Amino acid sequence: MIDLDTVKSHLRVDGDEDDALIQAYTDAAFSTFEQWTNRKLIAEGEPLPEPAGNSIVITKAICQGALLLIGHWFMGREAVVTGTIATEMPMATQALWGPHRWVNL
């Protein structure tokens, strides 16, 4: 949904030694979006399923939120980083993804 070169540019990574890790973070970020929002991502140009239900076509805001989350994970690769404040998800990612979130009542 975001090509590897775009993610690497966002992370300011030139080499290819971290490509597998970056791709794993990218896949995990979109999976996190789907779990957090209770929505199913559909690539642009891909037909919506019938019925559309909780499906959503990926937007620039969704991609930007994913890039921020990928950067967060890339910079802090361990579960706990000494000398920092623990956070669940970057606030900017929540702000970008929040409008798309479906909450089950």
Q: Which residues does each PLM region occupy?
A:
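Divalent metal-cofactor coordination and adjacent catalytic microenvironments
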Residues: M1-L105
